[in-house]
């Protein structure tokens, strides 16, 4: 039952283009949200024991320590939704003073979009890459900061192997 519910959550989030899934403990229950763009949508409210099992499922699949509920943990996986569909996920958990965990899942969509709107103003940024130093990219969630950085590096270091952390 938990596995099927988890697959359904991931499939729905992927199909509607959600960036994040939130499992948040409240006073007497857990709330499940998805974030699409800048909008966080409440999906439903669930019993704490059911959502604790769901969090345990995702932690197990992502290679995290299932029994550790106090310390923050990070994990990632290619989640098998069935029917040959795999969705890349990044997971983060954190416990509260009551021993309840919250879970945030970042859905890493695989489609590659052409960045045509950056082509006009990209040359000054490319010129700045010739100088050593720290480059700061800022903006709201989902605005393309990481995508821009990867595009700049791919353009600047064509034909070379680049590893990002």
Predicted regions and their residues:
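N-terminal anchoring/assembly modules that precede and organize ATP-driven motor systems
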Residues: 1-49, 83
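P-loop NTP-binding catalytic core
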Residues: 40-46, 51, 56-138, 160-162
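P-loop NTPase switch/communication element
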Residues: 153-165
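Walker A (P-loop) phosphate-binding loop of P-loop NTPases
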Residues: 142
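Structured core elements
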Residues: 22, 31-35, 88-90, 136, ...
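Hydrophobic positions on the alpha1 helix immediately C-terminal to the Walker A/P-loop
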Residues: 148, 152
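Active-site catalytic microenvironments for nucleophilic, acid-base chemistry
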Residues: 12, 61, 155
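Conserved lysine of the Walker
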Residues: 145
């Amino acid at each position: 039952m938990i596995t099927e519910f988890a697959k359904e959550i991931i499939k729905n989030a992927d199909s509607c283009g959600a960036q994040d899934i939130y499992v948040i403990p409240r006073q007497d229950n857990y709330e499940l949200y998805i974030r699409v763009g800048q909008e966080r949508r409440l999906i439903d409210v669930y019993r704490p024991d059911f959502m604790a099992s769901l969090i345990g499922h995702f932690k197990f699949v992502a290679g995290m320590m299932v029994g550790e509920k106090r310390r923050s943990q990070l994990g990632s996986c290619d989640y098998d939704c069935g029917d040959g569909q795999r969705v890349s996920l990044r997971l983060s958990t954190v416990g509260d003073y009551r021993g309840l965990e919250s879970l945030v899942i970042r859905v890493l969509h695989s489609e590659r979009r052409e960045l045509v709107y950056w082509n006009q103003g990209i040359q000054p940024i490319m010129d700045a890459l010739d100088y050593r130093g720290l480059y700061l990219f800022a903006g709201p969630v989902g605005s393309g900061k990481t995508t821009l950085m990867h595009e700049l590096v791919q353009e600047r270091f064509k034909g070379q192997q680049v590893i990002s952390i």
